[in-house]
Amino acid sequence: MSEMTHRPLLDVKGLRVAFGGKEVVHGIDFRIAAGEKLALVGESGSGKTVTALALLRLALNADIAGVAKLFDAQAASNGRDLLSIPERELRGIRGKEIAMIFQEPMTALNALYTVGDQIAEVLELHEGLSARDAQAAAVQLLADTGIPEPERRARAFPHQLSGGQRQRAMIAMALACKPRLLLADEPTTALDVTVRAQILDLLADLQRKHGMAVLLITHDLNLVRRFADRVAVMEDGHIVEQGEVATVFEAPQHAYTRKLIDSHPERNVAAVAAGANARPLLEATGLRVSYPVSRPGVAGWFRKGEFIAVQNADFRIAPGETLGVVGESGSGKSTLALAALGLLKYGGALKVDGKGWAVDRGSDLALRRVMQVVFQDPFSSLSPRMTVEQIVGEGLRVHAPELSTEQRRERALAALADVGLSEAQFPSLLDRYPHEFSGGQRQRLAIARALIVDPQLLVLDEPTSALDVTIQKQVLGLLQRLQRERGLSYLLITHDVEVIRAMAHQVIVMKDGAILESGLVERVLDAPEHPYTKKLVAAALLE
């Protein structure tokens, strides 16, 4: 779609948003034509979500200024300024003419009402339908979004649906009144990669069918490239560049746009020095993990059932090697990692540096020094009550109790320097608390905490999924450097095929607790054999 020369559907000029006197959106301008798909792209804190919320005056305690005119189809219309019309008039626009879908449907949907009731409520409010007609229309809307058994799903509560089904229900609710503009705030971020592709295709189909405009809020450039007509790039509350998607991606003008486009992780794996017959650092044969579950009906009173989370998994990791484990939520990959760490009961054989996990604490302590873990979310894996010195040096208190306080401080500073954090950057670094650091810096703290006991193998459980794309690239680069310098081995758990391609030597693909395919990364990702692997690679938008 070419740049608009005629009147748009929505025309935003000089939009400013401030909280408590601090301005976070700085006088931005953009337009959306009827039936157009505009992507607003940027990292966390860029102001893109606040912009969308401000258009409907949903940003709580915000001071909003500027003009956001919504035009009607009639040529004589002067438009309605969403930022100045009375609240009563705006209430008639929200949900009916402009609808919004949110990032996390589990929190956006009301847990106390069925999905059908929540969709029907919109139709009763805006369309004046009777309760019976609204319920029937809700079932049809769910069917239109591709939910199986829509009548049964309409009677379900949000927690009884999968993540993808909840997002489809949210889309059904948003489209109930056939809005002219849909604000989609990170609509696929909380979903698995294959479900993400399905929701994206669904949105595109519904957009074409209803002829509505879409403002897509996202940090995912692959999503923008595949879905949008035009893109506006936000940084620190400013739109730094906008234009047609093909033009911006092929010839970006602003340095920040170029940085975003270049932020995809690059493959830079260290050569594995060990020979084929070298003893692996981690080896599993017939690994099996199961949980007791309640059986339905009267049988559940007398006997528990069994849920198999990991079944007959075989794998090995050589010194200096990275094994990637990729799969969707519920595939068993994190359970496999917990079993490898000796934190779950398991069946089969599992050896760390040639030894199995023992019952007595002393034997396990030696293995825990060999094997450390870095968790997914640095915001929750670091105690907010502990200083950097306490967090990073904690392992030394257990594994090297003979060290003095000063020696522990020196080791902590050395580990922090290894991950790119120094007192030159952060005065009184050891006395600081986690909240004083960004997400990427917190993940560096978590890596330093793992490295301080000089392990041979790190279990990386989704180490970059909570980070922005540019920070993700930096953290992956750090892990690649540490592997080259220290000869570390990694067990890398992720749902991100791009991260596997950048980091791993070998990969195993898991679904429903079973390993469906395994082998060298180049072979598995470039020439997958199993249909599920093909689906996973295609959904990752790497083609």
PLM feature segments, named:
Residues 176-180, 452-456:
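A short, proline-enriched helix->beta-strand linker immediately N-terminal to the Walker B motif
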